[in-house]
A protein has these predicted regions:
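Nucleotide phosphate-binding/pyrophosphate-handling subdomain across enzymes
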Residues: 1-2, 10-13, 75-185
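Acidic, Mg2+-coordinating active-site environments of NTP-dependent enzymes
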Residues: 1-80, 93-111
Length: 185
């Protein structure tokens, strides 16, 4: 749980704060979610007259055979895997596709979103610059994770990469849960 000082101590409290952006009549896309958090989102959406499109109920996404497979009431999409590394990016891409389809966008728009997404400092491979020039045979990755979920995401991504010697340089504010971030690594 990140930003607890602003959003609340529990998942339902955090979901309630995040549900504050729900607008009347605007579809609410909900990715994989704790049941209590989903219930809060659904209740706020119902009060606001906003339709909910929740993962596992209204749409599904999975990696199958090196592809991203998305399904909702409009049918099945077989797309390339996300441009962004990390197994969690399939879920993120699924939420983006659900939003695009709710807006009436076609398969080409969904594929473009999946293959062109760029998120600096989230498992970003550095390819240019002084650090790369000083060690041209080394892969250098940058990730701005700073909470236990971020550490889990980095660990899951590293687990899918070819095995080799790995060094991690970590820097974050002293208000962050460093031990929680490092635990899965």
């Amino acid at each position: 749980l990140d930003h607890k000082q602003y959003l609340g101590e529990t998942l339902p409290e955090i979901a309630g704060e995040k549900a504050g952006i729900i607008k009347r009549g605007v579809p609410v896309i909900v990715g994989p979610q704790d049941e209590a958090g989903l219930a809060v989102m659904e209740a706020k959406a119902a009060r606001s007259g906003a339709p909910v499109l929740a993962f596992g109920q209204h749409w599904h996404v999975a990696e199958e055979g090196g592809r991203l497979v998305f399904q909702d009431e409009n049918g099945l999409l077989d797309l390339p895997l996300p441009n962004l590394p990390g197994p969690f990016q399939v879920q993120n891409a699924g939420a983006a596709i659900a939003a695009l389809r709710a807006l009436g966008r076609d398969e080409a728009a969904c594929e473009a979103a999946v293959t062109r997404a760029y998120w600096p400092a989230r498992m970003q491979r550095l390819r240019h610059g002084p650090l790369i020039d000083s060690a041209p045979k080394v892969e250098l990755w940058l990730d701005g994770g700073h909470n236990p979920a971020g550490g889990e995401a980095v660990a899951a991504t590293l687990a899918r990469m070819p095995k080799r010697e790995t060094h991690l340089i970590c820097g974050m504010l002293n208000t962050k849960d460093v031990a929680g971030y490092m635990r899965p690594l």
